[in-house]
Amino acid sequence: MDILDKLRGGVIMDVTNPEQAKIAENAGAVAVMALERIPADIRAAGGVSRMSDPKMIKEIIKAVKIPVMAKVRIGHFVEASILEAIGIDFIDESEVLSPADEVYHVDKNKFKVPFVCGARNLGEALRRIQEGAKMIRTKGEAGTGDVIQAVKHMRQIQSEMRQLTCLREDELYVAAKNFQVPYALVEYVHKHGKLPVPNFSAGGVATPADAALMVHLGADGVFVGSGIFKSGDPAKRAAAIVKAVKNYDNPAILAEVSENLGPAMVGINEEEIKVIMSERGV
C-alpha cells in the first residue's frame, strides 16, 4: 500500500510539536502536518511566513509512526529540497505561507517525495497535477474556522468536472486550452469524472459536521488545521472529526461525536478577513 492509499479517506491534522503529533496519532489521524505556527496564528501575526525549522520537523517525525507532512512557500524549490533531505513523507506547497514566486510553482516532477497543492477550481487543480502534484486539496481559507470557502472550492471543482464529462471529444481540445493543461489531463477527467489524484478538503474545517459535509461534497479526505488545537478539548475534537469522516453519512453517529466537545475555535467570519490566502498561487 503506497502513501496515497494510506491517506485516502482519512484526516490530516496540523501540529506544532511532538506532543500534539501524538494526540493526533492517538485520535486516528492518517498523517500530521508539522509547522511552527498553525494557520490561525500565522494569520494573526502577519509578516512573512516561511518553512518551519527542520529540527522541529525531525522531532515530530521521530515522535509518531504515521506520515509527516510539512509546508513550503509557493515556488520555493530550495525549501522543498531541504524537506526532502530530512526525510519528510509529503510536501505541501502552500498558500498559507508567504509566496516565494509570483509566477512559478515548484517543478514537483523533479522530486521523489510527493507534493500536495491547493486549488480553488479545476484549472488550478489540473495545472498543479501537470507540475507533479500527487494530491490536491481545496484551498478554503485557512486559519478562519469558517468552512464557506472550502465548500465553494469543492463545489466548483466538482461542478467543472461534471461539465467536462458532458463535452464531445472535439470540445476537449478547447477545454485543455482554456485550462492551460495537456489534453491528456482533460481527457482523463472527461472519461472518469474525477481527478487522477486524491482531492482532499482544507481550510476552515472546525467541527465534525464540517468534516462530514466536505466528504459529502466529494472530498477524499480532510485537512484540519487550527480547528483542533485552537479548540477547548483538542484530543476529543480530533477523535470526533476522525469518526465523522468515517461515518459522514450516519447522522446518529455524527450527533453522538458532536456532543460535549468544548468550545470550538472562535474563528473569523468571511467578511472580516483582511488577507485572502486562497488567492495566492493560481
From Swiss-Prot:
Q: How does it assemble?
A: In the presence of PdxT, forms a dodecamer of heterodimers.
Concerning its family, UniProt says: Belongs to the PdxS/SNZ family.
Species for this entry: Treponema denticola (strain ATCC 35405 / DSM 14222 / CIP 103919 / JCM 8153 / KCTC 15104)
Task: List the transmembrane segments.
Answer: none
Tell me which NCBIfam families the record gives. PRK04180.1, pyridoxal 5'-phosphate synthase lyase subunit PdxS
Q: Which parts of the sequence bind D-glyceraldehyde 3-phosphate?
A: R155
The organism's place on the tree of life at top rank: Bacteria
Q: What does the organism's lineage look like at the top? A: Bacteria, Pseudomonadati, Spirochaetota, Spirochaetia, Spirochaetales
Binding positions (D-ribose 5-phosphate) = D14, G143, G204, G225, S226
Biological or metabolic pathway of the protein: Cofactor biosynthesis; pyridoxal 5'-phosphate biosynthesis
- Please state what the protein is called: Pyridoxal 5'-phosphate synthase subunit PdxS
Task: Report the EC code(s) recorded for this entry.
Answer: 4.3.3.6
The top EC class, named as a word, is lyase
| Role, per record | Catalyzes the formation of pyridoxal 5'-phosphate from ribose 5-phosphate (RBP), glyceraldehyde 3-phosphate (G3P) and ammonia. The ammonia is provided by the PdxT subunit. Can also use ribulose 5-phosphate and dihydroxyacetone phosphate as substrates, resulting from enzyme-catalyzed isomerization of RBP and G3P, respectively.
UniProt keywords (A-Z) are: Lyase, Pyridoxal phosphate, Schiff base
* Biological process (GO), any one: amino acid metabolic process
